[in-house]
Amino acid sequence: MSVIVPPALVPVSPTTRVISCAADEIGEVAAAIVATVPSDGVLGVATGSSPLALYAALIRRRAEGLRTEGLRLLALDEYVGLAASDPRSYAAYVRSVIAEPLGIPAHNVRVPSGSTAADGAAYERAIAEAGGVDVQIVGIGRNGHIGFNEPGSDAETRTRVVELDESTRRANAEHFGGDLSLVPTHAMTQGVATILSARRIVLVAAGSTKAAALRAALTGPVTADNPASFLQRHPDVTVVADPDALREDR
């Protein structure tokens, strides 16, 4: 695995490390970091396509002896209005893609749910009661969102219901048969401040469609216009991305 960081993409923050590797290496490289979580630690999990290779690598490591059954999982977000049993829900994703293959029992898995401020506050309490997150996995949206913190989300936000940007809904329509009308308009998401409270953050990104947002997050000003830019304020961030996501000319 080679580490090649284009000069223009040297992050502003001295506490952010960027690892550039081939797209098919991202999962293994990120999993090596995530595997440092204690066997009974707390892992913050993202959903979607970006971290799939990471989870597959963790599953392989479990087959080779990594102890994962004692991990506690805390998910970043969930659509409002989808039952946990709905295969399109993030509760179903976390269960089928992460928890069950890693042997993690249901009582050690929490996914945001509900649609009220009280529900958001309850999830914040659950994070605190777990002792906080050891490693938080995140992706980055084309508009710079992390979790479902869309542009305009400030650094003080906590778990809450948000309205999804149309660009986000369009990007996720593939999981709803390509029908935008079926994609929920709102979600419950951990806030920026919630994400930043994790002890370590690992961001995974692949493909040129993420390049502009990632470049702005790493080298641009810290601004609510690109919520991922708030990661510059965190003391321990590792970005694992392929050369396309780190291109300077996008």
Please provide the spans of the model-predicted regions.
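N-terminal glycine-/serine-/threonine-rich phosphate-binding loop
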Residues: M1-L43, A245
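Glycine-rich N-terminal segment of FAD-binding domains in flavoprotein oxidoreductases
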Residues: S39-E64
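Class I SAM-dependent methyltransferase SAM-binding "motif I" and its flanking Rossmann-like core
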Residues: N143, G147-V192
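Short, conserved loop/helix-junction motifs that constitute active-site signature segments
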Residues: R62-R72, G103-I104, T194-A198, L231-H234
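Glycine-rich beta-strand-to-loop/alpha-helix junction loops that act as flexible
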Residues: V45-S50, V138-R142, A206
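Ligand-binding beta-strand-loop-alpha-helix segment within the catalytic cores
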Residues: S2-P14, L66-I137
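ATP/nucleoside-binding phosphotransfer catalytic cores, i.e., glycine-rich phosphate-binding loops
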Residues: P6, A193, S197-R250
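A glycine- and small-aliphatic-rich helix-loop capping segment at beta-alpha/alpha-beta transitions
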Residues: A57-R67, P151-R160, G220
